[in-house]
Regions:
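Hydrophobic, well-ordered beta-alpha structural blocks that scaffold small-molecule cofactor pockets
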Residues: 1-15, 19-44
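Phosphate-binding loop of NTP-binding sites
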Residues: 12-13, 28-29, 61-63, 70-133
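Short beta-strand/turn micro-motifs composed of small residues
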Residues: 18, 39, 68, 110-111
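General small-molecule cofactor/ligand-binding pocket signal
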Residues: 36, 51-54, 91
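Short, glycine/polar-rich helix-capping loops at beta-to-alpha or helix-loop-helix junctions
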Residues: 43-46, 75-77
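Short acidic loop-to-helix transition motifs that present clustered carboxylates
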Residues: 43-44, 57-58, 95-97
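Short acidic low-complexity segments
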Residues: 50-62
Length: 133
């Protein structure tokens, strides 16, 4: 993975792979011209025609960074060869979040099930210690 700096977000090009909650929130955050959006499920892209790009066009382009959504399985997705070839360019939405929130303490909870429950539990524990949450 390439090392990120805030300067990277000025002139570099990005492909966001995955149009779920994570991918769309990343798209909204980046809010720039040099961002393309792709999802294997074409229905996910119907409201984002200006940013959506076809697989055929992706294979002809060069990106500085590829932002891979958590739900994308690199070994089973339609762009697996492209991702393998560009493996060093792959970052996640969390990489971007941490870059822009270095001064804050963050607890990251990931996974398919139980995030809300674990988040609430951690919130209650920290609040009980009279800490600002």
């Amino acid at each position: 993975m390439k090392t990120l700096s805030k300067k990277d977000f000025l002139n570099n090009s990005f492909l966001i792979y995955g149009a779920g909650k994570s991918g769309l929130s990343t798209l909204k955050f980046l809010n720039k011209d040099k961002v393309d959006l792709f999802d294997d499920n074409k229905l996910s892209l119907k409201n984002f025609r200006k940013k959506a790009i076809s697989k055929k066009k992706i294979l002809k382009k060069e990106y500085d960074y590829i932002i891979l959504s958590p739900g994308i399985d690199k070994k089973k997705c339609s762009l697996k060869s492209f991702l393998k070839k560009n493996e060093k360019k792959i970052i996640t939405d969390l990489d971007i979040f941490y870059l822009f929130n270095k001064k804050n303490i963050s607890i990251t909870i990931t996974g398919t099930n139980g995030k809300s429950t674990v988040s609430k539990l951690i919130f209650d524990i920290i609040k009980k210690e009279k800490k600002d949450v």
